From Swiss-Prot:
One of its GO terms (molecular function) is zinc ion binding. A zinc finger (PHD-type) spans 129-190. The modification Omega-N-methylarginine is found at residues 36, 307. Residues 29-65 are annotated as: Disordered. A lipid is attached at residue 2 (N-myristoyl glycine). The modification Phosphoserine is found at residues 43, 51. Residues 29-38 have a biased composition (Basic and acidic residues). Pfam families: zf-RING_15. This is PHD finger protein 24. The gene is Phf24.
Length: 400
């Protein structure tokens, strides 16, 4: 059976061949050459000094011959892999010659972005994953890792060559990709990629005004100070009330589930991106960001917890929390904390205890009020998006 190659893969293969050719030429250029004295101006050939120089050059050439042969064999093996379509082995080439991570293109909002999308409760939407790896665009009989959010699938080797799998993360993806918890690809894991160029510019301006250093973790003091500065109006030195400051502290704790005393930059950036989406986007625009898998999980939750075409407000409140339910830490398969993308089973002990605790916190009248499917979706959309990252952090803590 032949190898199916797309135009994009053909371009990548040509780039790899160019890298291999450059490496081969560098090896030839670095090879010491034997110069004959009689061929150069001012030659000392025939003298004692010239004879000694020729002997030394011959010895250097003999010593470098095994190295040149080894480099030649490596390059020849690389050519064979490229010819057979097997790609470049990362352990034999520098990182610069591996697969190049994609250049992310930020989305643009359409003119009808704020119009209500057509997301009906029935009929259900079919969920079908892609057949080809999103990186190499080749179908193979090997196991493909599906994303839990979108329909993309990936080879572990392609993810490794792009630098997205390092160390124990390969084992993590292998264990989690085919479970109920699942694994988010590098597109869906980064919530900041949901922002447009204009929205990202606004967020960057806020970071600069509040003197936030990118790629640095934040302590609780840093986080609360930033929230004060971001919400500051006029000349007031204190922008948050005591209640808002306590809410910021609770959000910090949600972003730091392992209680390390600091929040990673990626989690902080995802949190701020969600807040900006809430501030600038209408609900209909947020609904258009949901993927078919996320819409289907929302339908399954609504039908399982609701009564026909409605669901109680208490269950709707519970659903907002259940998107972030984690697997029990004592379970053998839970060595890595990853956000759940849907409610856990009602029959599980964790679900029962969580449900009873939340019901105790809710007023009794909430259980008697019901909301329809569109309302349920609007109230849950931002939390469904917030549950995308693989991180165990809760990037937007629901109230209550």
């Amino acid at each position: 059976m032949g190898v199916l190659m797309s135009k994009r893969q053909t371009v990548e293969q040509v780039q790899k061949v160019s890298l291999a050719v450059s490496a081969f030429k560098d090896g030839l250029r670095d090879r010491p050459s034997i110069r004959r004295g009689g061929e150069l101006p001012g030659s000392r050939r025939g003298t004692v000094e010239g004879s000694v120089q020729e002997v030394q050059e011959e010895k250097e050439a003999e010593a470098s011959a095994p190295v040149v042969q080894e480099e030649s064999s490596i390059n020849r093996a690389a050519w064979e892999r490229l010819r057979d379509g097997r790609g470049v082995e990362p352990e034999e080439f520098d990182r610069t010659s591996r697969f190049t991570p994609p250049a992310f293109i930020r989305p643009t909002r359409k003119l009808d972005d704020d119009k209500p999308p057509d997301i009906c409760l029935e009929p259900r939407e079919p969920v079908v994953n892609d057949e080809m790896c999103d990186v190499c665009e080749v179908w193979t009989a090997e196991s493909l890792f599906p994303c839990r959010v979108c329909t993309r699938v990936f080879h572990d080797g392609c993810l490794r060559r792009m630098g997205y799998l390092q160390g124990d993360s390969a084992v993590e993806v292998t264990e989690m990709a085919h479970t109920e918890t699942g694994w988010s690809c590098y597109y869906c894991d980064n919530l900041n990629l949901l922002l447009t160029e204009e929205e990202m510019y606004s967020l960057t301006e806020t970071f600069q005004r509040c003197k936030v250093i990118p790629d640095c973790s934040l302590t609780l003091e840093d986080f609360v100070r930033y929230r004060h500065q971001a919400a500051k109006r006029g000349e007031s030195s204190r922008a948050l009330t005591d209640e808002q400051e306590e809410q910021a502290a609770r959000q910090f704790a949600a972003l730091d589930p392992e209680q390390r005393g600091h929040v990673e930059w990626s989690d902080f950036l995802s949190h701020e991106s969600l807040l900006l989406l809430l501030q600038l986007r209408p609900q209909n625009s947020l609904l258009r960001l949901l993927t078919v898998k996320e819409r289907e999980r929302a339908r399954a939750t609504f039908l399982a917890r609701g009564r026909g075409s409605t669901i109680s407000e208490a269950e709707c409140h519970h659903a907002r929390h259940s998107w972030f339910c984690k697997r029990l830490t004592e379970a053998p398969s839970c060595s890595v904390s990853i956000s759940h993308v849907g409610p856990i089973a009602d029959s599980s002990p964790a679900a029962s205890s969580s449900k009873s605790q939340e019901k105790a916190l809710l007023p009794t009248e909430q259980e008697s009020r019901y909301v329809d499917w569109p309302t349920f979706l609007r109230e849950n959309v931002i939390y469904i998006l917030a549950a995308r990252p693989n991180s165990g952090a809760i990037h937007l803590k629901p109230p209550g």
